[in-house]
Each structure stands twice: as C-alpha cells, then as structure tokens.
From Swiss-Prot:
Highest taxon in the source lineage: Eukaryota
Spans within the Extracellular topological domain: 1-32, 92-104, 169-196, 258-274
One Pfam family named in its UniProt record: 7tm_1
Assembly, per entry: Found in a ternary complex with CX3CL1 and ITGAV:ITGB3 or ITGA4:ITGB1.
Single GO biological process annotation from the record: immune response
Gene3D superfamilies the record matches: Rhodopsin 7-helix transmembrane proteins
Name listed for the protein in its UniProt record: CX3C chemokine receptor 1
Entry keyword set: Adaptive immunity, Cell membrane, Disulfide bond, G-protein coupled receptor, Immunity, Inflammatory response, Innate immunity, Membrane, Phosphoprotein, Receptor, Transducer, Transmembrane, Transmembrane helix
Post-translational changes noted in the entry: This protein is not N-glycosylated which is unusual for G-protein-coupled receptors.
Protein's job: Receptor for the C-X3-C chemokine fractalkine (CX3CL1) present on many early leukocyte cells; CX3CR1-CX3CL1 signaling exerts distinct functions in different tissue compartments, such as immune response, inflammation, cell adhesion and chemotaxis. CX3CR1-CX3CL1 signaling mediates cell migratory functions. Responsible for the recruitment of natural killer (NK) cells to inflamed tissues. Acts as a regulator of inflammation process leading to atherogenesis by mediating macrophage and monocyte recruitment to inflamed atherosclerotic plaques, promoting cell survival.
Tissue: Specifically expressed in subsets of leukocytes: expressed in monocytes, subsets of T-cells and natural killer (NK) cells in the circulation, dendritic cells, as well as in microglia in the central nervous system (CNS). Expression level subdivides blood monocytes into two major functional subsets; CD14(+)CD16(-)-CX3CR1(low) inflammatory monocytes and CD14(low)CD16(+)CX3CR1(high) homeostatic monocytes. Expressed in myeloid-derived mucosal dendritic cells, which populate the entire lamina propria of the small intestine.
Cell compartments where the protein resides: Cell membrane
Membrane topology (UniProt): Multi-pass membrane protein
Amino acid sequence: MSTSFPELDLENFEYDDSAEACYLGDIVAFGTIFLSVFYALVFTFGLVGNLLVVLALTNSRKPKSITDIYLLNLALSDLLFVATLPFWTHYLISHEGLHNAMCKLTTAFFFIGFFGGIFFITVISIDRYLAIVLAANSMNNRTVQHGVTISLGVWAAAILVASPQFMFTKRKDNECLGDYPEVLQEMWPVLRNSEVNILGFALPLLIMSFCYFRIIQTLFSCKNRKKARAVRLILLVVFAFFLFWTPYNIMIFLETLKFYNFFPSCDMKRDLRLALSVTETVAFSHCCLNPFIYAFAGEKFRRYLGHLYRKCLAVLCGHPVHTGFSPESQRSRQDSILSSFTHYTSEGDGSLLL
C-alpha cells in the first residue's frame, strides 16, 4: 500500500518524460519482504487486542455508557482495518494479485476502517471534552442512544470520505490500482492524498489538541489526587497519535509533490519510496496501540482479562465456571487510571474500560 496512498505499485521502474528510467527494483523487493512481515505482526496483535476490547464490552453485565459505545466502534474499526492486511500480504507476495472484486472490497474495507478508526478517536476526545469541560450542560445529551446515533453517523462519514479512495480501484495487469478517467488522471491522486492529509490527520489532530488542552486546564483547576495520572494519559493519547501518524503524512505530502516534479533525481525518488514503506509500518501499528491507550489502562479491563483467563483455564481443565464477570460488583473509580476522566461527571457515566 505504499506510494499513492495506499495503492500497491509493484513496478521496478519509474518513468519520467524528461529523465531516464529510475530503477526501484531493490526498494520494491525490500518493501515486499518488510511489509509482508509487518502486516502479519500488525494483524496478529491488532486482532487479539481489539477482539479483547469487543469481548470485554459485549460480555459486561454493567449498563453501557456512551464511552463504551465509542470504544466498541473504535475496536470494530480497527478490526475492519487489520482484517484487510492478510489480503494485502497475499497481494505483495503473489504474482496473481487479487481478483477484481477482492481488489475493490479490500481497498474499500481498508479505507473505511482507516478513516473510521481516526474519526472515533476524534469523537472520543470530543466526548471527554463534553464530559469534563462542559459536564453540566452535556449530562443529559451523553446517553447511550445519542452514542449509537453518533456512531452510525461516524460510520456513514467514514464510508463517504473513503469512497474517493476506492471508487476507481480495480485489477489491472495483475495489480490493484486506481484506473482513473482521463480527465481525472492528474487531479484524482492529488485529491486522494490531500484528503488523507487533511481529514485523516490534520483536522483530527487539531480537534484532539484543543479538546485535551481544555481538559487539562479543567483538571488543573480542580483538586484531585489522580489529576497527574489523568494528565499523563491525555498527553500519551495526543503524543502517540502525533508520533505514529506524522511521519507517514509527511511522506504522503511529499508523494503529492512528486506529481509536480518536485523530486526529479532518481536518488530522491528511491529515498521517498523507502521512507514511505517504513513510515507506513509505524502509522499502521497505531491500531495495535489503541486498545492499550483507551482500554487496557483501565483497572476494570485488567480485571476482566483476569476473569477471562481463569474462565478459559477452567474450561480447558474441565472445571465448572461458578461466577460471571460483573464490573459493577468490583466498582472502584479511584482505582482506574482513567477515573479522573469521568470523576467530574455523573456516576452513571462510568465506562467498563475507563
């Protein structure tokens, strides 16, 4: 999915009317091996981590909160994203590539999961802003019903925003590439990359930064011994998003400039191709980190993992399982790393994972 985000261009040469052919065969070969191994790792860790989040949320007997709804949809977005990686791995190592239908579907699911995950991260930051900074005004609006409605809207937005990324994708000469109409040949790839840079990075980062800055201001204005841990977690959320996605988006922007011949030399094109593959690995692994940032940090979720482990062990050993997991029976807001996020809101707002 490197080059022309995230089309997989397996050509060994890059041609320019005003220059000699630039050999990229060694870069392509390295990228094939490197990305194949990486996709397998991200698929494994992303699948396990996000499935645990889904299991924790769906098996809880505690009433759901609006935060639970968003966390569930974030995990589902990441699962949709990682589910496409085995198909991209097959595409990388196979000479036959993907069939036309699989090419279009895999690209569609990839981008819907990609934008959906980033949009839900943004929605979670807005929800935290409403719960803490505007607690009194937003209490009645932060219901499960509102969460479901907003989540459906986010999925619709993700599909709408993702559609330009896959609407022209098809199998062509054993490659899964964008086959654009002649009038869009030069414009559409630039629009695709710009959409990723703006809607998939710059705007979400701006919203998150504003929301968490105001949250930190509010936390510092209140006396709470858990304040420092809450602030550290907020900084971790923003820093992780910035650290994982910034290098890749810079490379996407430079890839866009390449359409305007900003990088005429072959060495620069080779470096850009290599850097795009490497930064892609960093960016895509963010979906493996989401469960740790938004869920695993919660004391209740760790208790659920312990319960799940004991339950599986009992089943494997043939022992009956006597108790079910009920976070409500182990309720302890102050024991949760994220408790300060909801401590200023109503008691009914607590998430299973927070």
